[in-house]
Amino acid sequence: MRNTDTPIAVEGYPFIAGFAAATLLLALLGQFLHCGFFVPATLFFVLTVFTVFFFRNPERATPGDENTVVAPADGEVIFLGKVIEPHTNGEFEKISIFMSVFNVHVNRAPISGKVVDGFYTKGKFFDVRDERASFENEQQGLVLETAAGLRMVVVQVAGLIARRIVCYAKTGDSLSRGRRYGLIRFGSRLDIYLPLGTSIDVVMGQKTVAGETVLGILP
């Protein structure tokens, strides 16, 4: 996979460069033409700062051993329960995490394992807090298999605002627990499907930190 360790996610560079260039241009026009460019220049400066903040890519310290499942996303737990995962048609323990525009949007591998399958589904753009988003929204999923042979599914779900999913991983890749593997732009949701028997360690409404918050222990 590509290098994903830059302090600002590389997907943010074009946005940052564009807003910064607009800020500089408007400031220069205001200086030399003595026109009212202060307000738009300030607006683009604020957009530049927010975009840097949005695409921040901090280091994380991953706890536990290889049976410890860590959160793949920063955000808030909005669903817990047993469900049938539609791609594999298997029954899993599902945890859904909602990412607001203020969360870090870089996604991390919840376990160490091999990507044995990947899928992309076009779809709608419901608000990701609506449970229909898990089944009907645009999404990118990975099926991971651990060294012990356990399988789980992690799905990036696009939302009402977030309509650009980035996934660096592909079938055949090996992921390390806590390693960055993708992101979703501007507010989104991530669904993780864990094997039955996993001991779940989070509750509804709990805040999560990608790569650090323990979601559960594999059976």
Swiss-Prot record:
Q: Any stretches that span the bilayer, and where are they?
A: none
- Topology versus the membrane, per the UniProt entry? Peripheral membrane protein
Reactions that this protein is recorded to catalyse? a 1,2-diacyl-sn-glycero-3-phospho-L-serine + H(+) = a 1,2-diacyl-sn-glycero-3-phosphoethanolamine + CO2
Give the cofactor binding note. Answer: Binds 1 pyruvoyl group covalently per subunit.
Per the record, residues carrying Pyruvic acid (Ser) are 188
- Post-translational modification, briefly? Is synthesized initially as an inactive proenzyme. Formation of the active enzyme involves a self-maturation process in which the active site pyruvoyl group is generated from an internal serine residue via an autocatalytic post-translational modification. Two non-identical subunits are generated from the proenzyme in this reaction, and the pyruvate is formed at the N-terminus of the alpha chain, which is derived from the carboxyl end of the proenzyme.
Question: Does the record bear tRNA-binding in its keywords?
Answer: no
Q: Name one GO cellular component term.
A: plasma membrane
| Associated pathway | Phospholipid metabolism; phosphatidylethanolamine biosynthesis; phosphatidylethanolamine from CDP-diacylglycerol: step 2/2
Q: How does it assemble?
A: Heterodimer of a large membrane-associated beta subunit and a small pyruvoyl-containing alpha subunit.
The name of this protein is: Phosphatidylserine decarboxylase proenzyme
Give the species this sequence originates from: Citrifermentans bemidjiense (strain ATCC BAA-1014 / DSM 16622 / JCM 12645 / Bem)
